[in-house]
Design a protein with these regions (language model features):
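Alpha-helical transmembrane segments of multi-pass membrane proteins predominantly involved
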Residues: 1-495
Length: 495
């Protein structure tokens, strides 16, 4: 008897669209050889992927590649949310890349192809139902970024950042695969739901030293991916050395992918009593170290990089509560899951808006510069600076950045419901620390520039490329909409 079900092509439509985009970009670059056409195909393909994912996710949950009740592909509302966010992020990053690509320092075809490949990994990741699919999708998301970070010609900083990112990612991937192999050795299964059921039904498996080692190694490997402290050292140097649009993608799509993978294994596969304390400790270390080090940063991208480390801590906090909430109500566990996903989506929108603001305020192809380069930017570019400032106060969790405020409130409420009041207090204290550097950058935008300041990049008026302005406007509007109607994300995250 054939126990393998037929393939559901509708469920796989988002993956088809994403992978097809990568192929079409290659063909367009080869046959048409016009950068504008190549970028247009990549952007339209990403938009098509977002639309297709939304349409498939709007219906009932679809499963395929199943053996019995265990499926390797599960596409529902949450998977659709991740796929749509990753696809739209790709469109935004392509738009931010236009000024840098016009300088000719990066090949357009390869650049767009690598972004499309990374998008494919992100789309598959949200629907992964087993460890192999999960890890392959995560690496498909990450591998193209090694090249994108170092693709800028003649830049030693980019080459060093790419090498650092590659070495650290190899270690992370090795640990993740080792953890998966050890779990397979213990349970004989790879499907996430099956792993969770086996460990729950057989307490003797959970108590094995090999199971503890497998959980620890797997968590460490995924912690590298999200730049959680103490596995974070690669992130600031990599972000600062990468081109601005690539740094934006790294701090959003790449981090979202790692968090989705971590959330999937914590919620569905790993024993909660082992993961809870570890994730809670990682969350405290990550948000505290990220905020404290960000206070001392003078370079814009490094500050955003350290702030993204801190933001990862806020997202990890509900995962600790999710594990600690085991044995409590299903509602508490669902709230923790929804809080983590919702915060990640809010963060991604605000972080992309922040990077769009930096790109709009800097000369084409330039790096993020220093905070001094941004002084007085609002006097020269009031609307761009206002959008950038809105993103910063949103990341800080202050009005009028209501999206960030609701994100933090959602996390704190989930922690309280999960019985982790002490962790909620740590989140609140760190949010106060974060106010210092977010408001410092925001204030610098409106501060007068010293009369003796040299006229370096950012000191004079910078003409904005139209598509960068569009990305900045769209992300700002999205942040405002999510702030006014956060339930749009919370409902999907809770499904």
């Amino acid at each position: 008897m054939n126990v393998v079900q037929s393939v559901d092509s509708v469920a796989l439509l988002p993956a088809y669209l994403a992978a097809g985009t990568a192929v079409l970009v290659l063909i367009t670059d080869l046959l048409v050889a016009r950068p504008r056409a190549t970028l247009a195909v990549a952007a339209l393909g990403a938009l098509g992927t977002a639309v297709g994912s939304a349409l498939v996710g709007a219906g009932a949950e679809r499963r395929t590649f199943c053996v019995g009740a265990d499926c390797s592909w599960i596409f529902g509302g949450r998977a659709a949310l991740v796929a749509v966010v990753v696809a739209l992020l790709t469109v935004g990053v392509l738009g931010l890349s236009v000024p840098a690509l016009r300088t000719g320092r990066s090949p357009v075809g390869e650049y767009a192809f690598l972004l499309a490949c990374s998008m494919t990994g992100g789309v598959v990741l949200g629907a992964a139902g087993d460890l192999i699919t999960l890890i392959v999708a995560l690496e498909t998301l990450t591998l193209p970024l090694y090249v994108l970070v170092g693709l800028r010609r003649g830049s030693l900083a980019s080459a060093e950042a790419a090498l650092t990112f590659f070495v650290v990612s190899v270690v992370a991937t090795t640990l993740t695969l080792l953890g998966a192999a050890l779990l397979y050795a213990v349970t004989g299964g790879l499907h996430l739901d099956r792993l969770g059921a086996l460990i729950a039904e057989q307490p003797e498996l959970r108590d094995l030293p090999l199971t503890t080692a497998a959980v620890a190694v797997l968590l460490v490997g995924l912690a590298f991916k999200v730049a959680a402290v103490p596995f974070h050292a690669w992130a600031p140097a990599t972000y600062d050395g990468a081109p601005l649009p690539v740094a934006a993608y790294l701090s959003t799509a790449s981090k979202l992918g790692g968090l989705v993978a971590l959330l999937a294994v914590v919620q569905r596969a790993l024993p909660a009593d082992q993961t809870g304390p570890v994730l809670a400790l990682l969350a405290v270390l990550t948000m505290t170290v990220g905020n404290l080090v960000a206070l001392r940063q003078r370079r814009t991208v490094r500050l955003l990089a350290w702030s993204s480390v801190a933001q990862a801590g806020y997202i990890l906090a509900p995962l600790g509560a999710l594990a600690l909430a085991a044995g409590r109500t299903d509602e508490a566990r669902s709230a923790a899951y929804a809080a983590a996903i919702a915060y990640a989506v809010f963060f991604v929108v605000l972080e992309l808006a922040a990077f769009a603001g930096v790109t709009a305020l800097r000369p084409a192809g330039a790096d993020g510069g220093t905070l001094d380069d941004l002084r007085g930017a609002a006097r020269r570019h009031p609307w761009r600076a206002a959008a950038f400032g809105l993103a910063l106060v949103g990341l800080a969790g202050l009005p009028p950045g209501l999206a960030g405020l609701f994100a933090k409130v959602t996390v704190v409420r989930a922690l309280l419901d999960g019985g982790a009041a002490w962790l909620a207090l740590v989140v609140a204290l760190n949010a106060v620390i974060g106010l210092a550097y977010y408001l410092r950058v925001t204030a610098a935008l409106w501060a007068p520039r010293p009369l003796a300041a040299p006229n370096v990049g950012g000191a004079a008026a910078v003409p904005v490329v139209g598509v960068v302005g569009v990305v900045l406007a769209v992300t700002t509007v999205a942040a405002v909409v999510l702030g006014v109607a956060p339930q749009l994300v919370l409902d999907l995250a809770g499904r």
